Swiss-Prot record:
Residues 181-196 have a biased composition (Low complexity). The lineage of its organism: Eukaryota, Fungi, Dikarya, Ascomycota, Taphrinomycotina. GO terms for cellular component: endoplasmic reticulum; endoplasmic reticulum membrane; fungal-type vacuole membrane; Golgi apparatus; Golgi membrane; PAS complex. Keywords: Endoplasmic reticulum, Glycoprotein, Golgi apparatus, Membrane, Signal-anchor, Transmembrane, Transmembrane helix, Vacuole. One of its GO terms (biological process) is phosphatidylinositol metabolic process. The chain crosses the membrane at residues 227-247. The gene is vac7. Component of the PI(3,5)P2 regulatory complex. Disulfide bonds: none annotated. It is found in: Endoplasmic reticulum membrane; Golgi apparatus membrane; Vacuole membrane. Its main location: endoplasmic reticulum. This is Vacuolar segregation protein 7. It comes from the Eukaryota. Glycans are attached at residue 18. The keyword Transmembrane helix applies. It comes from Schizosaccharomyces pombe (strain 972 / ATCC 24843) (Fission yeast).
Length: 251
């Protein structure tokens, strides 16, 4: 191998005469120098990212916020840490919460048969107060959502028995939204409807009875007035007859 040739550098010099301070004008010292007092700042405008008005889920919102934070200030690590620390759940309870990246029913766009089933909350099970001898309502009974069902924010149950996959996705029904009469037999529904209408029937009967009493009282009063007027007419007729036959001949 051939050895590399050494580099040759040439330096050009030029002699300059010394300039005395007398030749320099005095006005140079009086000029205000702004460049020496203030340093230039690299002013970078933050990019504004237009987010869509409608977000399908919290996961999309999280991704949009992270992307906007990274695009706005790529060199600032504190802003990225702030976004991640505030949005990532730390506890196990928060991981199973309904608000952790839930997709609504509209984003799935699945038919009714493909949707996941909704289990009953165990408050209406065999040990609950609404179960009839442990029969009609149990934990194994399931409900199928309607086609017009939309996503609504539901508060997760604090009971540890409800930690099923459906409750983790926020699809479990809360005990306040369950109507126990809808899943019962038609005969039981008829009995319940009849019992619920009994107060109205009793009030109607009491009103009819009060009306009958008032009509009876009015009839009795009318009969009394008729009898009084009849006796008064008889008295007037008898007095006229007595005056005509007994008193008039004497005059």
């Amino acid at each position: 191998m051939s050895e590399p040739k050494p580099m040759q550098m040439s330096v050009e010099t030029e002699t300059v005469l010394n300039v005395s301070q007398v030749q320099i004008p005095s006005s140079c010292d009086r000029k205000a120098s702004l460049e020496t007092l203030k340093t230039k700042k690299n002013a970078q405008k933050k990019k504004k990212i237009s987010l869509p008005n409608v977000m399908t889920s919290k996961a999309a919102m999280f991704a949009a916020r992270v992307a906007s934070a990274v695009d706005q200030d790529p060199n600032d690590e504190e802003s990225e840490n702030f976004v991640y620390e505030n949005l990532i759940p730390t506890n196990d309870d928060e991981l199973h919460s309904p608000s952790a990246s839930i997709h609504s029913f509209q984003t799935y766009n699945l038919p009714l048969e493909m949707l996941p089933t909704i289990n009953h909350v165990p408050y209406y099970g065999s040990a609950g107060t609404n179960a009839l001898n442990g029969g009609p309502l149990s934990n194994s009974r399931k409900l199928i959502p309607k086609r017009s069902a939309k996503f609504s924010s539901m508060v997760g149950s604090s009971d540890t028995r409800c930690n099923s996959p459906t409750t983790a996705r926020g699809l479990a029904t809360s005990p306040l939204q369950i109507n126990p009469t809808t899943s019962k037999s038609p005969l039981l529904n008829k009995k319940l409807s009849s019992t619920s209408q009994e107060p109205f029937r009793t009030s109607r009967r009491s009103g009819q009875e009060s009306g009958d009493v008032t009509t009876k009282m009015l009839r009795n009063l009318l009969h009394k007035r008729l009898w009084i007027s009849f006796f008064f007419a008889c008295f007037v007729v008898l007095s006229l007859v007595y005056f005509h036959y007994a008193v008039q001949p004497l005059l």
